[in-house]
């Protein structure tokens, strides 16, 4: 069970603006190496981003650029699976290095197919760590998140009794074929309603839809129609 877990933090809404990277190297399921670096994104910092991760322009004034540390990153990833918690980290690195050719694995796709309680919501890193008694350290520190994400992946593989190589076939399967749903939640909160179930032959069965803008019907009704 050899893989490298990666996490990045950004200075602003542009995925390219990486200001910190964290790397956790796992071998045979054990954490054997960690590495992190602040990054000068050569871009501005948004207040909201700094409020989340605590990194400011002053912190990265003398930090290397993402190009400066690329060789160190490649050295640690090598031919291993590059495990990330959601596709954002992959997008951020690909924005900086369009030719990057890592063997990516999105841990959230494994998580959502492992535990029924987080199949459709609640699969954020902090919540999944809490459910599995994993200490996350300082959330939104890139290294702490990388280590925690790697431990979550190991928990998921152990829960499913799978090897790392089995993940590819697992995440190709629709969640709905693995996690059973049958009815609308009883007494739902109309602001935060969850529609469970649906027509297995429906066009969007097993997918996640997001309604934006004004609709010609209440969102609850639209959700029910979409599930059919």
What is each PLM-predicted segment?
Residues 105-126:
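Short alpha-helix plus adjacent loop in nuclease-associated cores
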Residues 10-12, 109, 148:
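Short, glycine/acidic-enriched loop or turn micro-motifs at the edges of active sites
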Residues 103-105, 121, 160-165, 202:
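Short, structured loop/turn "capping" segments at alpha-beta junctions
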Residues 162-228:
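DNA strand-break repair and replication-stress modules
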Residues 1-103, 122-140:
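Conserved non-catalytic scaffold segment of RNase H-like nuclease domains
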Residues 42, 114-118, 215:
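Short coil/turn segments
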Residues 81-87, 91-92, 96, 124-186:
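Acidic, Mg2+-coordinating catalytic module of metal-dependent nucleases/exonucleases
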């Amino acid at each position: 069970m050899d893989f490298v877990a990666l996490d990045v933090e950004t200075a602003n809404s542009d995925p390219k603006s990486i200001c910190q990277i964290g790397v956790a190297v796992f071998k045979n399921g054990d954490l054997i190496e960690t590495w992190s670096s602040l990054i000068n994104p050569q871009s501005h910092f948004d207040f909201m981003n700094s409020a989340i991760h605590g990194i400011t322009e002053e912190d990265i004034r003398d930090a290397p650029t993402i190009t400066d540390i690329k060789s160190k990153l490649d050295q640690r990833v090598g031919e291993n699976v590059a495990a990330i918690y959601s596709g954002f980290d992959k997008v951020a690195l690909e924005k900086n290095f369009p030719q990057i050719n890592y063997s990516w694995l999105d841990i959230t796709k494994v998580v959502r197919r492992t535990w029924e309680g987080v199949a459709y919501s609640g699969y954020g890193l902090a919540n999944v760590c809490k459910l599995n008694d994993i200490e996350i350290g300082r959330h939104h520190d890139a290294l702490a998140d990388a280590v925690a994400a790697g431990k979550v992946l190991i928990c998921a593989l152990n829960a499913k009794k799978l090897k790392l190589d089995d993940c590819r076939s697992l995440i190709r399967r629709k969640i709905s074929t693995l996690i059973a749903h049958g009815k609308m939640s009883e007494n739902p909160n109309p602001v935060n309603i969850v529609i469970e179930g649906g027509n297995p032959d429906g066009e969007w069965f097993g997918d996640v839809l997001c309604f934006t803008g004004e609709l010609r019907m209440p969102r609850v009704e639209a959700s029910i129609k979409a599930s059919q």
